[in-house]
Design a protein with these regions (language model features):
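Ligand/cofactor-recognition surfaces for anionic moieties
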Residues: 1-849
Length: 849
């Protein structure tokens, strides 16, 4: 103000600037009023008092929002919107930038959806804080203020500083949280927010709103989001443990009827908001149900179909299922009558829990006649099928051509939008490319099929172009249908759909009625069954990997039965990996005609996944809406030579110890050469066995050493089951085997040196001696021996202590695996950690997202 007093002519500019600096539609409105008032008065006019501009409004950095109103205290908010203590309470978090712009339709929508389902809501809005600590009042402090409370005095406001000083003391008002924020929730206060989320122990959902992709473009796109948007919309929130990235609002343009100005505002996508609200409701239901009331579906992998194929990547699935059943029983779940051993469980699963291929109708009848096998009335499935989006239905019944036909019809509703039109063309091109790629796997029909696919693509592009330019679409539609009929007459397996419900996959007839066979076993409130097969015709592998062919009716029916008839409160997929997260359509930001979303339904999904399966695990989180609970890899050990390789090593050892003058030297050399020829390893090490020399013996020995230093898994891991000390020692030894040369030596290099050996020139015999001593010393350390009693080498002692620490983390993982699963089934929060194999990320171990 002193500046204005000195330069009064700048007063109007400063007044306008204050409105702008404080932001928000109400301030912009009053800024415009002030501008008009000054202009009117300067030109001799009068300004009506009803239009007098208000003073600039400063919004607080911590507030609650509802129905267009802002509240600065929880007491004030609860006076207007009291909580029902018998119902779940959902927190909502968003930045003040959208409130300042008056663009809160997405907030209003999710509040309406949640309250319509009987849930309480506490909608928090806070300021952004860029650099940690520069803005003490912000979205993070707002969440602390409105979501936490002092158990001794619930009405007292808790500050962020108080909370951080004693996080274990405070309690929480919410059962779940919805985040509308991109990048990180809590803005600059990343670590503090991470601690808050972990302590609240509630699921945190990612409700995505886009500023770049309109609804039509999103619906028609094949990627869902731009790859650059995926980073800040999904990947960054995932690092905070935020789950289920669901696309709920898009920008929509409208023209103001008074001014003619184009207005862009967030518009909720109502069916997506409903979907999010249903999923939130089912997650918090896990908190409110007692364990005896909960129904759980355990889903394992049976590929290819048949009795001998129950498994997952490096996981002992039968033993894992038994351990999970025991844990559920101990936790009070209604589960009984299950086998006590994995062998007995396998017998039951191979009798009643397998998929049966269409070429084995006799086996299907045997399965259908088993006691307690589930036969789902095809009419009930048909009723469920009719609830699916018409695009998905058409794709199942008629195949990929029916799908692309319906997509173009959808595109006609958005053809005036440049971005939607481009998305439709891109989807057409990708569809064409994928169709031709699949057609090429059938050489006898590939050429004819490829021509027709290209013709259909061009006809559909002409439909879109004609509609966009106001021309008739009749002719290109007619061309398309002619090509479609000709294409379908080729009868290329997988391309013509699965026919009308219920199809012919795993269906039987009883007394004139059709039924779909749902393989699986029920133990009380726990259903155990195989994920259905992705494809059934001709070459199963082709359809398994297809991105254009819909899953069969029985596949959809199986998931529909689990979600709606058995009415599972949660799905638990066991091991890497299932197929539902790989089904056709969008890469991320799925819609209601994307099959992964259809199969996930609205029920919570927990996925037991190997800790090093990072890339594929992302698919299960983003497309399968799964919460991952990692499991350890099996123990890893250096490779043991066997058979002829072991004999070869012995020959080399004998040869190296034989004096050069001995007549046996040449005989041993010839024996080594013959063994190299027998094992056919000469090409691998680039030697010529017809001209075998002493130098080649050294190359063969180096090859054997390389094999012995290669890590390999030992058996399979059983989820939640502890290892022996020997197995823990093997993995700990593998972790400390990473060698950076003399400047950053591995434990094995140091031990080799202590034994008087050159680590870079170890023979196969020496390599085995070094590996054995390494594991033995670590085993002794695990069992309580002090490293100093084994060696006085400071570097070895340091690495032995490090190995002991890794062994501790490994042992912690076993109990944490099962505890994390049970916590997820209680509607809890699974803390995120970066994944990878234990060798690269020894501190990651397992049990995290």
């Amino acid at each position: 103000m002193a500046y204005v007093n000195t330069y009064p002519q700048l007063a109007p500019w400063v007044a306008y600037g204050l409105y702008y600096a404080k932001k928000g539609t109400i301030n912009y409105e009053n800024q415009f009023k002030l501008l008009l008032k000054n202009f009117t008065v300067m030109n001799g006019g009068t300004w009506p008092s009803a239009w007098e501009p208000s003073a600039p409004v400063t919004l607080p950095a911590e507030m609650l929002y509802r129905d267009g109103r802002v509240f600065t205290s929880l007491a004030e908010y609860l006076a207007a919107y009291p909580l029902n203590p018998s119902r779940p309470t959902i927190g909502i978090a968003g930045l003040d930038s959208v409130l300042l712009s008056g663009d809160m339709a997405h907030f209003d929508s999710i509040i309406a959806k949640l309250t319509a389902r009987g849930m309480n809501v506490i909608p928090v809005v806070g300021a952004y804080s860029g650099v940690n600590g520069t803005q003490p009042l912000n979205i993070y402090s707002a969440m602390v203020k409105f979501f936490t409370y002092d158990p001794a005095d619930p009405s007292r406001v808790v500050t962020a500083a108080e909370y951080e000083a004693n996080r274990d003391y405070y309690r929480y008002r919410i059962d779940a949280l919805v985040s509308f924020t991109t990048f990180t929730l809590g803005s600059g206060f990343v670590n503090q927010t991470a601690a808050l989320l972990e302590k609240m122990n509630v699921p945190v959902f990612r409700a995505m709103i886009s500023t770049k992709r309109e609804e039509g473009e999103w619906l028609l796109s094949d990627d869902g989001l731009l790859w650059s948007d995926t980073y800040y919309q999904i990947a960054i929130p995932e690092t905070q443990g935020i789950i289920e990235p669901i696309f709920v609002a898009a920008p929509a343009k409208s023209i103001d009827p008074v001014t003619g100005v184009e207005i862009v505002a967030y518009t909720p996508i109502e069916e997506q908001m409903d979907y999010l609200a249903d999923r939130i409701g089912n997650w918090v239901r896990l908190k409110y149900l007692t364990n005896p009331e909960k129904k759980i579906a355990l889903i394992y992998y049976n590929y290819p179909p048949g009795k001998g194929n129950i498994g997952a990547s490096y996981l002992n699935v039968p033993e894992t299922i038994v351990e999970i059943l025991k844990a559920l029983q101990s936790a009070g779940y209604s589960v009984s009558g299950f086998p006590s051993t994995a062998d007995d469980l396998v017998k039951l699963l191979t009798e009643r829990g397998i998929n049966v291929a269409t070429w084995a109708p006799g086996e299907l009848e045997k399965l259908a006649n088993k006691t307690s096998i589930i036969l789902w009335d095809a009419e009930e499935y048909y009723a469920w099928f009719q609830t699916m989006n018409p695009i998905a239905r058409k794709q199942v019944v008629e195949g990929p051509v029916g799908y692309i036909e319906e997509m173009v019809k959808l595109a006609l509703s958005y053809v005036s939008s440049d971005t939607a039109y481009t998305a439709a063309l891109n989807t057409l091109d990708k569809w064409s490319s994928e169709m031709i790629s699949l057609a090429n796997t059938y050489p006898e029909r590939a050429q004819q099929a490829s021509v027709l696919i290209r013709n259909m693509t061009e006809a559909l592009k002409a439909v879109l172009n004609n509609a966009r330019t106001g021309q008739s679409t009749d002719a290109p539609w007619s061309m398309f249908y002619n090509f479609k009929n000709e294409f379908q007459s080729l009868a290329v397996p997988g391309f013509n759909g699965w026919g009308a419900p219920p199809g012919n996959v795993m269906t039987v007839e009883r007394k004139g009625r059709k039924y779909i066979v749902i393989p699986g076993i029920m133990f009380g409130n726990v259903f155990i069954g195989p994920e259905p097969q992705r494809g059934w015709e001709a070459d199963v592998d082709k359809l398994y990997h297809s991105t254009v062919v819909a899953p069969p009716h029985q596949y959809l029916a199986w998931y529909a039965w689990v979600n709606t008839v058995f009415n599972a409160d949660a799905q638990v997929h066991i091991g890497r990996h299932a197929t539902y997260e790989w089904l056709p359509r969008k890469q991320v930001a799925l819609s209601n005609f994307d099959f992964s979303q259809i199969c996930a339904g609205t029920k919570p999904s927990v996925y037991i996944y190997i800790v090093d399966g990072v890339g594929e695990g992302i698919q299960s989180k983003r497309r399968g809406y799964a919460v991952i609970v990692d499991h350890l890899t099996p123990p890893l050990k250096t490779t043991q030579l066997y058979g002829d390789l072991l004999e070869l090593r012995a020959l080399i050892d004998t040869y190296s110890r034989t004096p050069d003058a001995s007549p046996l030297k040449a005989e041993y050399l010839e024996s080594i050469r013959n063994m190299v020829i027998k094992l056919n390893i000469a090409p691998e090490i680039n030697i010529n066995p017809e001209n075998f020399t002493e130098d080649d013996v050294e190359k063969v020995d180096d090859y054997l050493v390389m094999l012995q230093q290669t890590l390999m898994p030992v058996g399979l891991h059983t989820f939640g089951l502890t290892w022996t000390d020997e197995e823990v020692a093997l993995l700990a030894a593998a972790i400390v085997s990473a060698d950076g040369g003399p400047s950053s030596p591995s434990l094995q290099r140091l031990i080799a040196s202590s034994m008087g050996m050159d680590f870079d020139k170890l023979t196969a015999i020496q390599a085995e001696e070094v590996n054995n001593r390494t594991v033995d010393w670590i085993l002794q350390i695990i069992r309580g021996r002090a490293p100093e009693t084994l060696t006085d080498d400071a570097q070895i002692i340091e690495l032995l202590n490090r190995a002991k620490g890794y062994a501790y983390l490994i042992n912690q993982s076993f109990g944490s695996e099962m505890n994390s699963l049970l916590d997820a089934l209680n509607g809890g929060f699974i803390t995120p950690r970066s994944g990878n194999d234990p060798i690269r990320k020894p501190h990651g171990t397992s049990n995290r997202q």
